[in-house]
Structure formats: structure tokens, C-alpha cells
UniProtKB/Swiss-Prot annotation:
This is Glycine dehydrogenase (decarboxylating). CDD domains: GDC-P (cd00613). One of its GO terms (cellular component) is glycine cleavage complex. The glycine cleavage system catalyzes the degradation of glycine. The P protein binds the alpha-amino group of glycine through its pyridoxal phosphate cofactor; CO(2) is released and the remaining methylamine moiety is then transferred to the lipoamide cofactor of the H protein.
Length: 957
């Protein structure tokens, strides 16, 4: 045997698991594109002046088992205290049936945002259920399909209040003093760039302040008080002030709906519905508003529509509000939200139903009543007479109480003057309450749970009678049927089967990087050591998290060529916003706050101008030349015209046209020459890692889509993570946090997310990916992603022209197929091709972005040659079908493309088409068939007849 022991140990085994084509397949594809090796291909495509001479030093690869063992040892450093800190985060009991069949199921977590509704009906139904939960609990008319977290939802509510306000000259936003501090932090950050003045005061003093356009109230208050805001809201409404309420989703099960009290906007975190705290996230926020404000709402909204056969079908509604269409005029820069987490919360509500939720909420409240009664019986004073689950307890010996709590491995809220906060949750037991008595009163308190229970059961006054809900919730059949595990398992499976995810087929979406989310990467997110930590626990209890985050940040620094990384932004859009704020504050620190012009190429993703607008900048568009590259002449002219007002440029690399622009360094130099900063959008980082880096190119700041390049799954539309890398001069200006000091960051800036490290519990996914790939594997992943894209481009270019290419006719990691000539010749559009691909078992590529009338294809490195060939064969077969239309064999108004997709029912229905059933549903010999459950959606009907809540079950049958 000639192999060494090191070779037999094969520490790089995961690289071969992650990268789809094996060595032989890679060579076949290299031969097809006319390159000798991966290095030779990279050398041809990537400009030589930006190629790294040595790979980033992120270590050697590790096997899946070694990496898991290493991360487990790190996770074990976290201390799992019982946390009663509250402040919007509580422990939960995630039903195992949802854990196993959704959170651990690639059929749910590897799907993409449901832009293609025909292959997304399952998660769209779950999201519609989430919206129904929101509507029932808030008492309002219109709900979104989730936002990023409660604090960012508050910032969105403020912005929305200003948009809809009739008080056009008012510029002040009032925040009640008992709003969660992290929420206030994020609101202040957003208000600064919008030029709003934030006033913080007791809610009852709001009428003392003038020029207020909006008010934010908290129900229940951060220290536990239940407020009856009915009269106050009525008075505010009479003065045309827009009222927003941040609400506790579990408390709303028992309390009067804020919408019934007159609130215009209600939002909050859905974390309590089954989603672990995870050191801060990810969690879905719910958001609801009055019907009259629906077109000003942020985020995705799922609506009920019809398909081509007239059957009920679901889709994302009113997309004209969103950043990918309205750009800087969009309601928000929100792109990805928190679909996977919203669906967990949705199914939690389905599984428990109204009876189960009331039982949970009443149990939490009863235990809180028992705790309150015992403490008061022993002479302790409560700050609030009315509460749901949180007590604010005045204590004389606060230091002693906190010391006893620490000894008992209990976290209490400690930032309240002369008091401690205690928030109970669905995991709290009578034994926990007895332990709390001992912490607060000493071991010899003599209290008994059953005795106290009898007292409070007959005489509980902790919720005002006027604040008790008097209407029924969750009356729709979906919330009253699936309560056995068998029924729930089958319901979830029925939803999963309606969708197309990576566990069934390649998802070739350009600019989305739908790569493998490996099982080994996903395993740690359910470890209790990561899942159960409160984001505001003492730092010494989170040493495992701190070590993992620091190590991941160090790797990202080396991979990006930056000097520091901030982990707080919990989406790519938030990363853009945070990066632009860093630039803004940097200019202000140099007395150049007047620099507010952001240059953005015409090809940019819609989030870029939307984020620039949110950061208080003016957008100036830079033209692209005929080859799709930034027009340097126009760039120089625009930069010179901006002069001392130039803030930055936002540029994507490789470009959104799928090309490594040769002049990228010159672009950076021009902007720097005029005093601007370079924001390099990290959306296409998968074509940079190990080959080049933003810092080496000359950029100053980038966000990194960990849910693209670094393997966090898309979750059907979230979660995402968008940490930012910065050069040293921008490091003092990254987001900070008002509750937790972020170690290693000397920033005094406000927060952009509720938690200091954003969605911390999914960071282990990226840690595992980098650890298992090592420097060698990461570079190879980028190279194979480039190879796969060029292989597709070379094989399809005769049938579908590749719109933009770089040097030697090559593309980067994605390519744009130009459908416009075919449409002119035949009338068949990119939409028809996208829908026909469903019949072949594929999710469509990205449609009409960045160029209308095109399809953008990104295969990633994870797809094998077999799958690439299957996609190519499907596209070529579709081209042959188009030729049939062109030749007149099939009429333009009745052919397999315009009628696509085809569903099972059509196999047994009357058939009057000029093509066969076999051509319709088994084209080109498709064997492993994916069946969509609806035909093509009627988008116009959906927006004209907007309906965003659950429809009768019969509509789905």
C-alpha cells in the first residue's frame, strides 16, 4: 500500500462531500470549457492584480466528526443557568414533532424565498397561518409574514407611522419609558438617519409633548406592568397621532387585543411560540396594521389568489412595495425575513390550538400569581399590581439576593434600581417557584405551592377585568384539528410535499448561492448549550459562545482582508444598513457629515438603494457600459460632481452581471480620490473566497451573507445573517448595544438588531463549514462554483445567449441567459421558461434581475455534473419546445410553455391541448417527478382582491 497514514486519515474528507463534482467530473467539465485545471480557469477569469498570492490562513480542514467534537467542547463552556431575565426572551418548549419534522428537515430549511409560488404552496400556507395567528391576537386587519426581530419591527413601525401620518410637519416620535431597552436602542439608531427626534417619557405624559407624529407603547411593559391604554389611545387618535404597540405574543392569548383598543400598528416577537432563545436569535417578529395602511407596511405579505384553473392558491402579495422593485422608494430594505422561525411559531399555534395556548398562558400566569402571593405574604413589595408573567420585586439586600441566585444557577434581571425582575415562562414548574422563594426569602420561608394556589385561584386581581380578552381566538379549523402527533406529523409532511427544496433538486437562482447546507453543519444549532442561553446573561456564562464567535470573526477577517468583523446584523439588508451607518459616522467624526451621496451602479440589487435611503443618503446612479461593467467615465463624472458630498459607492463583486470587472481596483481608487468610501456588497462572495478578498481589492466595508457563502440555509425566506467586515478606520463605528458590552468592539454606536450578536445560534453553521473546509477547501469551493457556471454557460450559449461575459468569454460564478431575442421571435417569455422548468423538476433561475427579460443561473459548487447535465438537458429540451412554437406546430396561446406548470389533476381531466399529457407532465423522459399542486398564479387577481388570512379548508381540497 502506497498511501501514508495522513492520507488514510483524510482530514479533508468533507471537502469531497461538499463539492458536487468529483475529480473526474471536474476534468470533464474543464475539458468542455477549454481549461486545463481549476487554477488555470481561475487565472483566465479573475483579474491578475486582485488574485491572492497566498491563501487565507484559516487552518487545515477537519472531518465532520472532529469538527463536531471540537465545537461540542467549545459549547460546553456555556453555563446553562435558568434565566428569568425576560426583556422579550424566555425559555420555551419546542414540540419534538416540530423539531424533528421542520427544524431538522431539509425539506423545510433548504427552500428559498417563495418568489415562485407554484413550488412554494406548503410554506406559504404555514406563513398564512402565521398571519392568521397575528391577526387574531392583535385584533388588526392586515399582517405580514414576519420581520427580523421585535426591535427592528419597532423601527419599521416608526418609519411606517411617519409615512401614513397626516401630521406632515410633526417630526417627533414618542417612546414610552417602559419599552424594552434594546428596542429603544434600535429605534434611536433608525430615527437618527431619518432625522426624527425620539422622546422617552412615561406614557401618561405623552400629551405634554408637541409635534409628535407617532407613539410606541409596550404591552406588557418591560418590568411587567399591564397597562389599560384604551383611554390614552383614544385621545391620541383624536389628535391624529399614529399609535404602535409592542406586544407579548403569549400575553395576548389572555389580554385584550391592542387593535381592539384602537392601536394602528401592533408588533412583537414570536419567540415564545416554540423558538429557543439561542443567545438572541434567530426569532420571527410579527407585525400587523389597520387595513388602510396595508400599502405602507414593511416586509413580505402572503395573499390568497387563484391559479390559471381558478383554484385557490397562495402568493407573496403587493410586491410593488418592496426593495427589489421600488429600490430607494421602498417601504423598507427588508429582503429575507424569518420564514423558518415564523413557520415554527405558526405550527406551534397549530399544534397547541386555542385550548392549548390558553392552558400554557394561564399556567404561566398562575405560577406568577403564586410567586407574587408568596413574596407579598412574606413582606416583599411588588412594583406593579397588574402583571402577566413578570414581577418587579423590591428587595433591600439586592446584592445578597443576586448572590443566592447565582449560587442556585439562576439569572434574575438586575438592572432595575432597588429591585429585581423575574419573568416566568412555559418551562417554569412549581419546583422552580419554590427555588425562587428560597433565593428571595431564604430556605426557611415555609411557603407551600398548593396552599398559595388555592388562595390565588379564587382571588386573582393581577389582570384588570377590562384587560381580559372576551373574544375567541384561532377559530379557523387548521388550529383545531392537528393536536395528536400523528395528525401533526402528517400535516407538516403534506405541506413539505408541496414545495421544492434542495433535498429534491438543484435551485439555480442567480445571486442567491443555494449551496449545500450539510447535516454536520446543522447539528449544533439544536444543542442545548447553544439553544438555551439568554442574550443578556452574564458574559461569564457564555464563554463558549464568545469563543466560537471570536474564532468565526477571526476566520472571516482573514477571508475578507478586513481588520474587524461585527456579527450583529441579522440579515444581509441589515448588514448593508450597518455598513453604511459606519461610513456615515466615520465622515461625521471627521466633521464631514455633509457627505451624503451614495453612488450605485444601475445593475445593483434593490436592497442597495433602499439601504442607502435608510442610512440618510442620496442615491446617484452610475451607468453601466454595453458590456455590463461600471462605466468608468460616468463614475468619474458622478464622483467629481458629488465632490465633497461624496459619501461612498456600493458595488457588488463579481458584478451582478456575473462578471469579474477588470477595473474594480480603479473604481475603488476613483471613489477614494474624492474622499468617499467603498462598500463592497458581499452577495457574490462565493466567487471570492480564497481567490481574492474585498479588503485586498480596496474596499472599506462589506456585509457577508452567511446564508449564502457560508452555508446557513435560506429557510424558505430566512433566517439570514449579515455581519459586516470593516477596515480599521471604520471599526469604531460599527453597531454597539445598550444592554451588553460587545467584547473587542470599542464602538459607541447604537444597535441595529435586538441582540448584540444578532442571530447567534445559527453562527455555528458557518463555524462548522469553515472548520471542515479549511483554506484548501474554501478556495476549491469558489473555483468549482466558477467551473460549474462556465460549464452551464458554454453548453447553453448556442440555445440561450449569455448576455455578459468577461475576458476570454468567461463568466464568474453565475451567468445571465438572454431570453429577449427568443421572446421577440416567438412570444415565449422568461416567465414561460421558468414555469416550464417546474414540469422538468427544477426551481426557476432568477427572473428579470438584474436585466429584464433574462434568467440568471447560479449553480454553486455543491451540484454534481449529473445534476448540472439534468438542468442543461431540461433547458435544451425547453428550447426545442420553443422551436415547435416558432414553427407553428403548437400555437402561441396553447402549448406546454404558456400552460406550465401542469398538475396531477390534468392527467385525468379532459384533454384538449395540441400536445400530449406525456409531453405536459413527463417531458423529455423526466422520471423523478416533482408535482406542483397549483397551476400558474394569477398575480393581478391576487393584488386586486387582497386577502391575507386563512381561507376555509375546503378551498385547499
Amino acid at each position: 500500500m502506497t498511501q501514508t497514514l495522513s492520507q488514510l486519515e483524510n482530514s479533508g474528507a468533507f471537502i469531497e462531500r461538499h463539492i458536487g463534482p468529483d475529480a473526474a467530473q471536474q476534468q470533464e467539465m474543464l475539458n468542455a470549457v477549454g481549461a486545463q485545471s481549476l487554477n488555470a480557469l481561475t487565472g483566465q477569469i479573475v483579474p491578475k492584480d486582485i488574485q491572492l498570492a497566498t491563501p487565507p490562513q484559516v487552518g487545515a480542514p477537519a472531518t465532520e466528526y472532529a469538527a463536531l467534537a471540537e465545537l461540542k467542547a467549545i459549547a460546553s463552556r456555556n453555563k446553562r443557568f435558568t434565566s428569568y431575565i425576560g426583556m422579550g426572551y424566555t425559555a420555551v418548549q419546542l414540540p419534538p414533532v416540530i423539531l424533528r419534522n421542520m427544524l431538522e428537515n431539509p425539506g423545510w430549511y433548504t427552500a428559498y424565498t417563495p418568489y415562485q409560488p407554484e413550488v412554494s404552496q406548503g410554506r406559504l400556507e404555514a406563513l398564512l397561518n402565521f398571519q392568521q395567528v397575528t391577526l387574531d391576537l392583535t385584533g388588526l386587519d392586515m399582517a405580514s409574514a414576519s420581520l427580523l426581530d421585535e426591535a427592528t419591527a419597532a423601527a419599521e413601525a416608526m418609519a411606517m407611522a411617519k409615512r401614513v401620518s397626516k401630521l406632515k410637519n410633526a417630526n417627533r416620535f414618542f417612546v414610552a419609558s417602559d419599552v424594552h431597552p434594546q428596542t429603544l436602542d434600535v429605534v434611536r439608531t433608525r430615527a437618527e438617519t431619518f432625522g426624527f427626534e425620539v422622546i422617552v417619557d412615561d406614557a401618561q405624559k405623552v400629551l405634554d409633548h408637541q409635534d409628535v407624529f407617532g407613539v410606541l407603547l409596550q404591552q406588557v411593559g418591560t418590568t411587567g406592568e399591564i397597562h389599560d391604554y384604551t383611554a390614552l389611545i383614544s385621545e391620541l387618535k383624536s389628535r391624529k397621532i399614529v399609535v404602535s404597540v409592542a406586544a407579548d405574543i403569549m400575553a395576548l392569548v389572555l389580554l385584550t387585543a391592542p387593535g381592539k383598543q384602537g392601536a394602528d400598528i401592533v408588533f412583537g416577537s414570536a419567540q415564545r411560540f416554540g423558538v429557543p432563545m439561542g443567545y438572541g436569535g434567530p426569532h420571527a417578529a410579527f407585525f400587523a396594521a389597520k387595513d388602510e395602511y396595508k400599502r405602507s407596511m414593511p416586509g413580505r405579505i402572503i395573499g390568497v389568489s387563484k391559479d390559471a384553473a381558478g383554484n385557490t392558491a397562495l402568493r407573496m402579495a403587493m410586491q410593488t412595495r418592496e426593495q427589489h422593485i421600488r429600490r430607494e422608494k421602498a417601504n423598507s430594505n427588508i429582503c429575507t425575513s424569518q420564514v423558518l422561525l415564523a413557520n415554527i411559531a405558526s405550527l406551534y399555534a397549530v399544534y397547541h390550538g386555542p385550548v392549548g395556548l390558553k392552558r400554557i398562558a394561564n399556567r404561566i400566569h398562575r405560577l406568577t400569581d403564586i410567586l407574587a402571593a408568596g413574596l407579598q405574604q412574606k413582606g416583599l413589595k411588588l412594583r406593579h399590581a397588574h402583571y402577566f408573567d413578570t414581577l418587579c420585586v423590591e428587595v433591600a439586600d439586592k446584592a445578597g439576593v443576586l448572590a443566592r441566585a447565582e449560587a442556585a444557577e439562576i439569572n434574575l434581571r438586575s438592572d432595575i434600581l432597588n429591585a429585581v425582575g423575574i419573568t416566568l415562562d412555559e418551562t417554569t414548574t412549581r419546583e422552580n417557584v419554590m427555588q425562587l422563594f428560597s433565593v428571595l426569602l431564604g430556605d426557611n420561608h415555609g411557603l407551600e405551592i398548593d396552599t398559595l394556589d388555592k388562595d390565588v385561584a379564587h382571588d386573582s386581581r393581577s389582570i384588570q377585568p377590562a384587560m381580559l380578552r372576551d373574544d375567541e381566538i384561532l377559530t379557523h379549523p387548521v388550529f383545531n384539528r392537528y393536536h395528536s402527533e400523528t395528525e401533526m406529523m402528517r400535516y407538516m409532511h403534506s405541506l413539505e410535499r408541496k414545495d421544492l427544496a434542495l433535498n429534491q433538486a438543484m435551485i439555480p437562482l442567480g445571486s442567491c448561492t443555494m449551496k449545500l447546507n450539510a447535516a454536520a453543519e446543522m447539528i449544533p444549532i439544536t444543542w442545548q448549550e447553544f439553544a438555551e442561553l439568554h442574550p443578556f446573561c452574564p458574559p461569564e456564562q457564555a464563554e463558549g459562545y464568545q469563543q466560537m464567535i471570536a474564532q468565526l470573526a477571526d476566520w472571516l477577517v482573514k477571508l475578507t482582508g478586513y481588520d474587524a468583523v461585527c456579527m450583529q446584523p441579522n440579515s444581509g439588508a441589515q448588514g448593508e444598513y450597518a455598513g453604511l451607518l459606519a461610513i456615515r459616522h466615520y465622515h461625521e467624526s471627521r466633521n464631514e457629515g455633509h457627505r451624503d451621496i451614495c453612488l450605485i451602479p444601475a445593475s445593483a440589487h434593490g436592497t442597495n438603494p433602499a439601504s442607502a435611503h435608510m442610512a440618510g443618503m442620496q442615491v446617484v446612479v452610475v451607468a453601466c457600459d454595453k458590456n455590463g461593467n461600471i462605466d468608468l467615465t460616468d463614475l468619474r463624472a458622478k464622483a467629481e460632481q458629488a465632490g465633497d458630498n461624496l459619501s461612498c459607492i456600493m458595488v457588488t463583486y463579481p458584478s451582478t452581471h456575473g462578471v469579474y470587472e477588470e477595473t474594480i481596483r480603479e473604481v475603488c481608487e476613483v471613489v477614494h480620490q474624492f474622499g468617499g468610501q467603498v462598500y463592497l456588497d458581499g452577495a457574490n462572495m462565493n466567487a471570492q473566497v480564497g481567490i481574492t478578498s474585498p479588503g485586498f481589492i480596496g474596499a472599506d466595508v462589506s456585509h457577508l451573507n452567511l446564508h449564502k457563502t457560508f452555508c446557513i440555509p435560506h429557510g424558505g425566506g430566512g433566517p439570514g445573517m449579515g455581519p459586516i467586515g470593516v477596515k480599521a478606520h471604520l471599526a469604531p463605528f460599527v453597531p454597539g448595544h445598550s444592554v451588553v458590552q460587545i467584547e473587542g468592539m470599542l464602538t459607541r454606536q447604537g444597535a441595529v438588531s435586538a441582540a448584540p450578536f444578532g442571530s447567534a445560534s445559527i453562527l455555528p453553521i458557518s463555524w462548522m463549514y469553515i472548520r471542515m473546509m479549511g483554506a484548501e477547501g474554501l478556495k476549491k469551493a469558489s473555483q468549482v462554483a466558477i467551473l460549474n457556471a462556465n460549464y452551464i454557460a458554454s453548453r447553453l450559449q448556442d440555445a440561450f445567449p449569455v448576455l455578459y461575459t468577461g475576458r476570454d468569454g468567461r463568466v464568474a460564478h453565475e451567468c445571465i441567459l438572454d431570453i429577449r431575442p427568443l421572446k421577440e421571435e416567438t412570444g415565449i417569455s422568461e416567465l414561460d421558461i421558468a414555469k416550464r422548468l417546474i414540469d422538468y423538476g427544477f426551481h426557476a433561475p432568477t427572473m428579470s434581475f438584474p436585466v429584464a427579460g433574462t434568467l440568471m443561473v447560479e449553480p454553486t459548487e455543491s451540484e454534481s455534473k449529473v445534476e448540472l447535465d439534468r438542468f442543461i438537458d431540461a433547458m435544451l429540451a425547453i428550447r426545442a419546445e420553443i422551436d415547435q412554437v416558432k414553427a407553428g406546430v403548437w400555437p402561441l396561446e396553447d402549448n406546454p410553455l404558456v400552460n406550465a406548470p401542469h398538475i396531477q389533476n390534468e392527467l385525468v381531466a379532459e384533454w384538449a391541448h395540441p400536445y400530449s399529457r406525456e409531453v405536459a407532465v413527463f417531458p423529455a423522459g423526466v422520471a423523478d417527478k416533482y408535482w406542483p399542486t397549483v397551476k400558474r398564479l394569477d398575480d393581478v387577481y391576487g393584488d386586486r382582491n387582497l386577502f391575507c388570512s386563512c381561507v376555509p379548508i375546503s378551498e385547499y381540497q
